Amino acid sequence: MYPSQGVGVIKTIEEKVFKSNKVLYYVIYLEVSDMTIMVPVDKATGLGIRPIVGKDEALKALELISEEYEPIPSDWKLRYQMNMDLLKKGSIMDIAMIVRSLYHRSKVKELPILERKLYDSALKLLEDEISCSLRKSKEEVENLIFTRLETETE
């Protein structure tokens, strides 16, 4: 999982010479953007690249989105920055919190364009990771997510 980019598959590990040093790189294919990237193996963790979560963690993220939550600041710029910080951390629980809070905020008032894009990105990241983790179609996971989101509001 690559924060803010989504689920990727390590295709190979290649050795390249960089500034006269041999460096190992992950060659990662990101399906969502149909893009291949190279990331130095020794910097991958620092960049937030992590394995897909296990089934238990994916189910916890689904549970989180149906739990009660603290209302978020009404100032959208502050909300946006807080959520961007969570997105950069890249944990599935942080992404689930973004989806939950912005979904419920959108029910109160239409989200500003930047926040709407952030919500859409976080939702896609959450769907993709849970889909891979639970081995379910993206459509099934999308239905699960929205069912959970609606459960809390009723």
Could you describe each region identified by the protein language model?
Residues 42-154:
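Charge/polar-rich, low-complexity and marginally structured segments
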Residues 1-47:
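A positional/architectural concept
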